[in-house]
Amino acid sequence: MDFTLSDNFIEQYRRKRAPFGFNGLGELVYMRTYSRLKEDGKNEMWWETVQRVVEGTYNMQKNHIERYDLGWNAWQAQRSAQEMYERIFNMKFLPPGRGLWSMGTALTEEKGLYAALNNCAFVSTQNLKDDLSKPFTFLMDASMVGVGVGFDTKGAESFVVRGPKTDRDSELYIIPDTREGWVESM
């Protein structure tokens, strides 16, 4: 069963004005950048974004604790999640933008792609001879969830790139237009 904040707790924030500040610019940036489109076609309001992020964070924590049999305490989790909600709602602290955008969405909840919470990553090309596609697969996978990827040039000149062979029949590869399809194409 997923972690959810109590309805009574959330109710007190539904009509509360968020302290965006900056003469409306803060709210404009929030609506443009972090407010996700809901199933009904409307954008999330701040209280809904905070709820999604907090519940997503606690779902991740609950899954980890239960997987390793560390003793989930539902009462303590509800209490600390409410404190986290209140602090985020009032902008006493904010998670990173990537967290506001992806935490608690299908990307993290269903697919388990927590890499989407990262801004950037790095991959080395040093061992290209061992696995030619590995750094490129990593780069594609991370890029497809919005992570910027840096790389080194240690693998430069470790193999020669030649043009296509023209003396054979061409083959057609159909790549599924999904994140997984494009990653697999590497």
Task: Give names to the regions the model predicted.
Residues 1-185:
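Extended catalytic cores of very large enzyme megasubunits
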